[in-house]
Swiss-Prot record:
The active site is at residue 89. NCBIfam families: PRK04296.1-1. This is Thymidine kinase. It comes from Oceanobacillus iheyensis (strain DSM 14371 / CIP 107618 / JCM 11309 / KCTC 3954 / HTE831). Homotetramer. It is found in: Cytoplasm. SUPFAM superfamilies: Glucocorticoid receptor-like (DNA-binding domain), P-loop containing nucleoside triphosphate hydrolases. Its EC number is 2.7.1.21. GO terms for cellular component: cytosol. ATP binds at residues 15-22, 88-91.
Length: 207
C-alpha cells in the first residue's frame, strides 16, 4: 500500500455489467461524504434506466448525480471547492472525457471513474482503455457467469433471449432484460471475425 503525497489522481473501476462497478463508486463517494469532503458526481444523460438524476446500482443502492451530455460540462460545473469528482458509465462519453479527467486530476481533484472495459463484442470499449493507462489506481471487478459459475469478465447482449450479432450497434442502454454477465468460454457473439492468428497457431501446434 502506498500513500498519496500530492492531491489529484485518477481511480478507475472497471469490469463487466453486474460486477458491482456503480456500487463501488457509490461506496467511495459515500465514504467521502461522511468525511465532509465536497463531492460532485456525474453520469451520461443517455443512461436513464433507473433514475435520470441518480446513479443506481443493480442492487438498488444510489447516490445523486448530475446528468450531462458532454464531458466538457464537468469542467464548467466544477469549482475550486470540489475535492472529488465521480463519473459513472464513462464508456458512454467520447474520448474528450480523457482530457477532462486529466485536467481535473491536474487541478488537484481526486477523480473516481467507473465503466465497462469491454463492449458486448468482448473488445476494448473506448475510452476506458485510455483511462486505464493514465489512472493511478485500477480496480477490475468480475461478475459471476450464470452458465457455469466462473468469474465473468464479459457482457453478453441478448436480443429476444438470443446472443446479439457482432454487427449490432455498440451502444444500447439496458439492464438485465438486454444483458447478462458471461465468462470467456460462454460469451457468444455471432458473426464475430475469427482470430486467424490464434487459429493458425493452434493448428500448427496440433500438426
Amino acid at each position: 500500500m502506498y500513500v498519496m503525497k500530492q492531491n489529484g489522481w485518477v481511480e478507475l473501476i472497471c469490469g463487466s455489467m453486474f460486477s458491482g462497478k456503480s456500487e463501488e463508486l457509490i461506496r467511495r463517494v459515500r465514504r467521502a461524504t461522511y468525511a465532509h469532503i465536497n463531492v460532485r458526481v456525474y453520469k451520461p444523460a443517455i443512461d436513464d434506466r433507473y433514475d435520470d438524476k441518480a446513479i443506481v446500482s443493480h442492487d438498488g443502492t444510489s447516490t445523486m448525480a448530475r446528468p450531462i451530455h458532454d464531458a466538457v460540462e464537468i469542467l464548467e460545473d466544477v469549482d475550486n471547492n470540489v475535492e472529488i469528482v465521480g463519473i459513472d458509465e464513462v464508456q458512454f462519453f467520447d474520448n474528450n472525457v480523457v482530457d477532462v479527467i486529466e485536467e481535473l486530476a491536474d487541478r488537484g481533484i481526486r477523480v473516481i471513474v467507473a465503466g465497462l472495459d469491454l463492449d458486448f463484442r468482448g473488445e476494448p470499449f473506448e475510452p476506458v482503455p485510455k483511462i486505464m493507462a493514465l489512472a493511478e489506481s485500477v480496480t477490475k471487478l468480475n461478475a459471476i457467469c450464470p452458465i457455469c459459475g466462473s468469474p465473468a469478465s464479459r457482457t453478453q447482449r441478448l436480443i429476444d433471449g438470443k446472443p446479439a450479432s457482432y454487427n449490432d450497434p455498440i451502444i444500447l442502454v439496458g439492464a438485465s432484460e438486454s444483458y447478462e454477465p458471461r465468462c470467456r468460454h460462454h460469451h457468444e457473439v455471432p458473426f464475430r471475425p475469427e482470430n486467424n492468428f490464434a487459429t493458425k497457431s493452434w493448428d500448427a501446434l496440433k500438426s
